[in-house]
Structure formats: structure tokens, C-alpha cells
Amino acid sequence: KAVATLYSECCQIVVRKDSGITGIDDLINKTVSVGASESGTEKNAEQILKMSGITDELINKVNMDYTEAAGKLKDGEIDAFFCTAGTRTEVIGQLSKECDIRLISLDDKCIDKMLSAYSLCEKYTIPAGTYNGQDSDVTTIGVKAVLIAKQSLSDDVIKNVTKTIYEHADDFKYATSLDITFDINTADGVDIPFHSGAAAYYTERGINVLTE
């Protein structure tokens, strides 16, 4: 069951700056890491490619985690990699210091299709300067990370967890390098049922969430 929306992870598409790849269509006939097998990154990559009209036959898809993909991109063994994570992703930040990279923006048509198809998606801007050498904003898709718990956990425990997340949000910011925010009002956009303990917390604050 859902407990809380945590922060927006963004779909980042990374290429070498000298690759000549400037848009999603340029990935055609290229070798692209779509993330580890069965990962959230792979799912998002497949959604973005589908909405962009890029079928499996048009690219050479490989499965790698972020760290491996960054190394392969640096060495020129792949042309691009997808990474769904919070901005200021450490792996991408380190890569940007070791070689010149570019993050690819998604076009409005792809973004509009993603927003229509998936309720947890949002338009997301990666500000200029987020990574070394990134001199302009990058427009992409954000996906809300959702905390999940077993329904067997007690209502009191889950209600307290939910309360802690939102009422001590600043403490979490100091504990990570990620650029994160917690917005309680995004909970009503989650399309999976919430744990009854979490739902009780939201109800007290006038927020309706899905419970079944």
C-alpha cells in the first residue's frame, strides 16, 4: 500500500557532448542503455521511446545500471544512457567532471503524451548548472517516487511514519545530496491504494487519497 509521495525523480538521458546527439530522434541506430533489467529506469525509458515513436528495431538497447553505463559512455562503448533519479545524481555529476556530456531535452509532443498516459508524471526542468558544463535548462519528465508499505503494518506505525516525512521534511534534505522537496498535496494524484494509517493522516489534513 502507498504511504507517501517522496520527491520527483527525473528521467535523464545522458550523451557525450561530442556525439552529435541533440534530441531523442538522434538515438535511432545508436546503442542505448535503458537501465538495469526490470528497473524503474527501464520502464521509463520504454515509455519515453514509445511515446517518441522509437521502436525496439530502431535502436540497440542494452541493460546496465547507472555506474556501468556511465563508464561505458565515457569509454565510447555506448552512445547514451537513461537514468531515472533525483537531480544532482552523483554518478552523472562525477561523469560530467571526467568527460564533456550533454543531457537531452524531450520535445513537447512526447511530454504531453506522457502526461496524458501516466498520472504520476509531470513536466520537469533540470536547471542549467546542475551538472558540470550544463549551460542551459533541460526539459524532461519527472516521476513521483512513492513510499510503499505492507498493509499488515499497524495504522499507528504508518500514520507516524507519514507524519514524520512531512513534518520533518527539512531533516531529510540535509541527509542527502539530492535536490528534493516533499509536497503533501501530491498524494491525491497517486493511483494505487494508500495504507489505512497513511490515509488517516491525510484525512486529518483535508486531503482525499485512494484507499481501495
What do the predicted segments below correspond to?
Residues 1-28, 33-36:
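Short, glycine-/small- and polar/acidic-enriched structural segments
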Residues 3-10, 96-97, 105-107, 139-142:
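Short Pro/Gly-enriched coil loops immediately N-terminal to beta-strands
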Residues 9-11, 28-30, 62, 99, ...:
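Envelope-exposed proteins and targeting segments
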Residues 18, 36-43, 64-67, 82, ...:
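Soluble non-cytosolic domains of exported or imported proteins
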Residues 30-36, 144-152, 184-192:
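Second-shell loop/turn segments in exported
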Residues 42-62, 74-77, 94-96:
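Ligand-binding cleft/hinge of the Venus flytrap
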Residues 64, 68, 74-75, 85-103, ...:
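An extracytoplasmic/periplasmic, membrane-proximal ligand-sensing/linker region
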Residues 102-160:
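C-terminal lobe and pocket-closing loops
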